[in-house]
Design a protein with these regions (language model features):
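Glycine-rich phosphate-binding loop of ATP-dependent small-molecule kinases
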Residues: 1-230
């Protein structure tokens, strides 16, 4: 989903991820570079004094580019790049152990996500996508209310890119593609009811279903034999 869609909130509700913890009740590991990024920004003193907010939308363009710009492939070592590299390292360690993961990202880059899906499937993973959808109006409102606000133009471009990719994602994931509408501001009890239904219908079924990927099946069988189990 796009920025301001409430992806992390929905992930917490659907998968049962306690706050300040990156593991779900079913053992899935949460992977989100924003966690490392916000940690580093606060560590290096980029909070707006006395507010606890990270008002990066108010930074001059050159400051934003020098600190929050770039990704793991960019030449300049920005705080964002360092966060991406930290997240990449953690994710690769999860992949080495074939641990289940919840990869929390925007999905604005279809080619990158499609490549990542192929890499995971080549290791034996079964993949599913939950697309968290919101209107642009709601995304802008949520962005203005959160501690780390994105510049409006960046949010709008990312939101539009994600929306244009929705049909492609549906084709890529097929029956393993689920859309969650998170446009409404729900009361806690209503949110629990809504997300509880989605969890029971889709999430629990996916998590509890044995691995179908033939590469994954072989990996599991091989490792059970190494441990002396049949």
């Amino acid at each position: 989903g796009g920025p301001g869609s409430g992806k992390s909130y929905v992930a917490q509700e659907l998968f049962g991820i306690p706050k300040k913890v990156n593991v779900s009740v079913s053992g899935l590991k949460s992977v989100n570079s924003d966690t490392e990024f916000e940690f580093l920004l606060k560590k290096f003193g980029f909070e707006t004094f006395g507010t606890g907010r990270l008002d990066i939308d108010q930074w001059p363009d050159e400051v934003f580019d020098a600190i929050a710009g770039g990704d793991e492939d960019s030449e300049q070592m920005t705080v964002r790049k360092k966060a991406k590299l930290m997240t990449k390292d953690r994710k690769e360690r999860y992949m080495e152990g074939r641990l289940g993961m919840i990869i929390d990202g925007t999905g604005h880059d279809y080619a990158k996500l499609s490549k990542e899906k192929k890499q995971l499937e080549a290791l034996g993973y079964d993949c599913s996508m939950i697309f968290v959808n919101t209107s642009l109006k709601v995304a802008l409102q949520r962005n203005s209310e959160r501690a780390r606000r994105l510049p409006k133009d960046i949010l709008m471009k990312s939101w539009k890119d994600v929306q244009s990719n929705m049909g492609k994602f549906q084709g890529l994931f097929g029956s393993k593609f689920v859309v969650v509408d998170n446009s409404k501001f729900l009361k806690p009890e209503d949110a629990q009811k809504k997300f509880g239904m989605i969890t029971r219908k889709y999430i629990s079924k996916f998590v509890k279903t044995p691995v179908k990927n033939h590469i994954g099946k072989k990996w599991i069988k091989h490792n059970l034999l190494l441990r002396g189990k049949k």
